[in-house]
Amino acid sequence: MRNAMAGVVFAIVVAGTGAGVGGADGSTDEAEVLKLDQRIADAVVRGDAAFVDSVTPPDFVMVHGDGWTNGGKPLLTDTEQSMLRRVTTKYYDVLDFDSVKAEMHGDVAITYGRYLAHTTSGDDPGRRWFSVWFERVYAKRDGRWVYLSHRTVHGPTFGADRKSVSDK
């Protein structure tokens, strides 16, 4: 319940800073944001830091782990530069999205859903596969969508193989 409430509070705070919900081209913007969300994930797996850099601002923030949702600390907080280093080193070799939706607020979009990920780094094979439920924030700047922020709202949940995390 706390995790759900934290996500709702976060969404309300972010939405409150933007324009009203929707617009004449809301469905086009929604499709564009969802496509960009996937393109970013694909670029991360490819190690395409140039593309990821082109759609993230210098004040980008990525909060890993859901400890923050109940008063604790996140596992890690990335800036744009530390996240780009992770992209360059191809930390993730799988980043598959599912259940992703977009909530549109004029020139602000919140995407939320889950991804399954795999990394070859680390000594513990039981922590190489994981699932994460997330919220991401985008803003339309100068006619294009920019990826501002990512927050884990549940997870990561680790497992030894894809199947062990696919229902988490």
List each model region and its residues.
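Bacterial N-terminal signal peptides that target proteins for export
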Residues: 1-8
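A solvent-exposed, acidic/Ser-Thr-rich amphipathic alpha-helical stretch
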Residues: 28-34, 49-105, 114, 126-130, ...
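Short glycine/acidic-enriched loop and turn motifs that connect beta-strands
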Residues: 117-118
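Short hydrophobic/aromatic-rich beta-strand segments that constitute the beta-sheet cores
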Residues: 62-63, 111, 147-149
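A short, polar/proline- and glycine-enriched secondary-structure boundary/capping micro-motif
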Residues: 121-124, 157-162
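Short, low-complexity N-terminal intrinsically disordered segments enriched in polar/charged residues
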Residues: 10-12, 18-59, 107, 148, ...
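Short beta-strand edge/turn micro-motifs at domain boundaries
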Residues: 131-158
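A short, structured loop/turn motif at beta-sheet edges
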Residues: 102-109, 125, 138-145
